[in-house]
């Protein structure tokens, strides 16, 4: 802390010197405040370090919301928006997550794609899905880490791929330190993986385990090319060295799955080292975003076409030469997911998969069991609150009720106001 002390009687100084002395005092004060601001910038922690203190939980989000003015305009502004988009998605605030992602310029590639999708032919994914699964032994799909839409979509691939001999599900979220996940068959918060603490991702892994997949970590330390190369090496070591004829799914973030020669991404290194040409499909750029769903070029080419289909479903994009489009993206195909429709303000339609249903939490229930505002997490009673919840939601004091997306079964609800926990049990029938 910097203090500048003024002489309380400085106005009584020699009048000829008074004006110049005031200027000196002002300059001293300005310099002190500037220096103090610089010190504060240097003392400001990386937002990921701040969030880690509370396990990247609701409490982390609440703390960082109150620090918004410190991070905006600082050297940590972009990672702040990046992390906030992830944390908002974990508590069911998907619109806020998208807005934070847009502030962090994480959608820049989508603008470029919108300008190039002028002569695109689209067909339902269901017409080619069987062929993709049957004619490949390695399929790589991707996501944007703040958007669970792709995770819900990938769940729909698991059963059909398993029926065609795929036995491993590799994901970059998984930590190698959780070596017992395949035996335990549950996802531990903060232990199994980072992104998988989000309910839909947790359910993706839970579903894969229930079907019979073996979960495989492949994340690597480091940055840039070394990280990409090491990720490919980990896939080889953790799967192919043990099962040379294996068929498997790989789920990664954004461009890491690209297998285009010369791009130095994980998918390309894997192809080069193994001779296996994986089928790589971008499932990230054409997913939910308020800003980009309103763009005329995207709406006309994709979302309106899907809305006009008898059954709204994902579509695959081809160019006028009937090649899977985009053929210059470094991936084999782009998949466009249907326009998001919110059933309730906090429940997107893609969240009700695998027989999930809406369960209402009203103010009367909250008053009896929880806090006026906070976050509620719904854990399977058979798993307990150390595991990733089936759903969770951050609610405000003015919300009369809200919905959770839950399966039939018994649940442990945990209410958190940022300082304490309260618990209740429910049965969804």
What is the predicted role of each segment?
Residues 1-46:
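Bacterial Sec-dependent N-terminal signal peptides
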């Amino acid at each position: 802390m910097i203090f500048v002390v003024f002489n309380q009687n400085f106005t009584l100084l020699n009048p000829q010197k008074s004006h110049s002395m005031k200027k000196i005092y002002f300059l001293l004060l300005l310099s002190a405040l500037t220096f103090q601001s610089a010190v504060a910038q240097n003392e400001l922690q990386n937002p990921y370090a701040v969030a880690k203190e509370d396990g990247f939980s609701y409490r982390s989000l609440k703390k960082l919301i109150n620090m918004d003015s410190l991070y905006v305009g600082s050297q940590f502004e972009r990672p702040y928006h990046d992390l906030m988009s992830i944390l908002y998605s974990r508590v069911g605030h998907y619109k806020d997550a998208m807005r934070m992602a847009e502030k962090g310029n994480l959608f820049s590639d989508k603008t470029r794609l919108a300008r190039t999708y002028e002569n695109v032919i689209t067909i339902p994914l269901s017409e080619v899905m069987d062929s993709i699964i049957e004619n490949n032994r390695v399929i790589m799909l991707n996501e944007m880490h703040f958007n669970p839409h792709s995770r819900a979509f990938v769940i729909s691939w698991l059963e059909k791929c398993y029926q065609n001999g795929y036995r491993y599900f590799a994901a970059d979220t998984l930590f190698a330190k959780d070596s017992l996940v395949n035996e335990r068959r549950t996802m531990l918060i903060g232990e199994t993986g980072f992104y998988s603490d989000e309910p839909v991702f947790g359910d993706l892994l839970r579903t894969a385990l229930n079907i019979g997949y073996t979960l495989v970590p492949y994340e690597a330390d480091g940055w840039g090319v070394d990280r990409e190369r090491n990720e490919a090496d980990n896939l080889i070591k953790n799967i192919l060295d043990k099962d040379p004829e294996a068929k498997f799914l790989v789920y990664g973030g954004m461009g890491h799955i690209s297998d285009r020669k010369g791009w130095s991404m994980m998918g390309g290194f894997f192809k080069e080292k193994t001779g296996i040409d994986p089928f790589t499909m971008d499932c990230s750029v054409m997913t939910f975003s308020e800003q980009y769903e309103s763009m005329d070029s995207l709406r006309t080419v994709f979302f309106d076409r899907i809305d006009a289909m008898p059954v709204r479903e994902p579509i695959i994009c081809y160019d006028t030469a009937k090649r899977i489009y985009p053929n210059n993206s470094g991936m084999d195909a782009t998949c466009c997911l249907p326009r998001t429709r919110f059933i309730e303000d906090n429940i997107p339609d893609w969240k009700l998969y695998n027989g999930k249903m809406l369960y209402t939490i009203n103010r009367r229930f909250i008053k009896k069991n929880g806090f006026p505002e906070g976050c509620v997490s719904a854990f399977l009673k058979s798993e307990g609150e150390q595991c990733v919840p089936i759903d969770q939601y951050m609610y405000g004091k003015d919300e009369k009720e809200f919905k959770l997306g839950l399966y039939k079964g018994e649940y442990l609800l945990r209410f958190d106001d940022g300082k304490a926990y309260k618990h209740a049990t429910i049965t969804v029938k």
